[in-house]
């Protein structure tokens, strides 16, 4: 018969699993301290990731707004005809 994951039932009595590892209180305390340090580092990484994610969203929104403004400016320039030339300015430009 198999276990919940499809693994065969294995008992300690079968001699396959040997649970002779016994840890002292100091070893448990050291492991606990290391896990706390790892957890603290992971929290710091998560905070930095959240900050970067926020900055990227701000940059993306700024980029979208700049593109929208640029497109609007191009559309405005295409919609309005170029200014009429002043005959006096044309005469001064052709003189050499």
Curated annotation (Swiss-Prot):
Residues 63-96 are annotated as: Disordered. Keywords: Cell junction, Coiled coil, Cytoplasm, Cytoskeleton. GO terms for cellular component: anchoring junction; cell junction; cytoplasm; cytoskeleton; subapical part of cell. Residues 39-79 form a coiled coil. One of its GO terms (molecular function) is molecular adaptor activity. It comes from the Eukaryota. Pfam families: UPF0184. One of its GO terms (biological process) is intermediate filament bundle assembly. InterPro entries: BBLN_eukaryota. It is found in: Cell junction; Cytoplasm, Cytoskeleton. Residues 87-96 have a biased composition (Basic and acidic residues). Its main location: other. Belongs to the UPF0184 (EST00098) family. Essential for intermediate filament organization in intestinal cells, interacts with intermediate filament and regulates intestinal lumen morphology. This is Bublin coiled-coil protein. It comes from Ctenopharyngodon idella. The lineage of its organism: Eukaryota, Metazoa, Chordata, Craniata, Vertebrata.
């Amino acid at each position: 018969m198999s276990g919940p994951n499809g693994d065969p039932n294995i008992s300690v009595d079968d001699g396959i699993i040997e649970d002779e590892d016994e840890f002292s209180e100091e070893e448990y305390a050291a492991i606990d301290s290391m896990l706390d340090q790892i957890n603290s580092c992971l929290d710091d990484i998560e905070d930095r990731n959240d900050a970067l994610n926020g900055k990227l969203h701000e940059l993306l929104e700024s980029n979208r707004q700049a593109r929208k403004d640029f497109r609007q400016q191009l559309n405005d320039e295409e919609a309005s005809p170029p200014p009429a030339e002043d005959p006096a300015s044309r005469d001064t430009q052709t003189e050499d």
